[in-house]
Amino acid sequence: MNDNVILTEKKDAVLLITINRPEKLNALNANVLDALKDTLEIFLKDDTLKGAIITGSGEKAFVAGADISGFLKGDRNMGADFAAKGQTLFSSIENASKPIIAAVNGFALGGGCELAMSCHFRIASENAKFGQPEINLGIIPGYGGTQRLTRLVGKGRAMELMMTGENIDAQEALRIGLVNHVCKQEDLLTLAETKMKTITSKSRVALTQIIIATNAADENPEEGMKTEALCFGKSFASDDMVEGVTAFLEKRKANFK
């Protein structure tokens, strides 16, 4: 689709989504964003798919940033539109009703770091590098980086990363909570698939409500608690709850559909 800038592979109930511009270190441009948006819509509509993994083509980069080759031709309105397009897509990933993991296989810089942060959690290879180097271009993160990075690692660390434009390695990203796991490059997809297999064996209803309720933690505490209560009610009234509780009482593994 769209010149094969996005590759997809279905593995059982999991969709592997690969950003495929290795010659450009998988940099994001309008074509990639459009193709990723189309892929996300297909994924969410397909009831046979329970989760997705996003990664980059090759061993050098997850996504090394946005393709800045056209920036000098733009103006303020173009910049705002460019940011809004990415923000809308990445918010759709963050709020997707199915779990999405980022398997970060190299450079995740600028828009690439922002894409990884929009996923529900991140697994990184040992050679991964993270950063928001936009300040070196005289701009700021525009795809939600100022917001998500702050929420993930705290205001002080986020300010430092964005103000210095410096990159951090996978171990530092793990230490500050930007990623959940670090592994060898050759083990990255295996680990991501193993985690996703565990996740997708759980209740679909509960997974969706966990995403909604956890994202509501970004609201004020009172509103977040209200959202959690509503989400708990939806899961409590589901067939999955009946199966889960029955299986527990019968001392067997739950069989969620």
Predicted regions and their residues:
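Conserved CoA-thioester-binding segment of acyl-CoA-metabolizing enzymes
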Residues: M1-T55, S91
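C-terminal long alpha-helix characteristic of the crotonase
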Residues: P22, I123-A128, V179-T227, G233, ...
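Glycine- (often His-adjacent) and acidic-residue-rich active-site loop
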Residues: K45, G56-S92, A108, E219-N220
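CoA-thioester-processing core
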Residues: L89-N95, A103, L109-M163, I176, ...
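Well-ordered beta-strand positions
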Residues: F121, E160, T164-E166, E172, ...
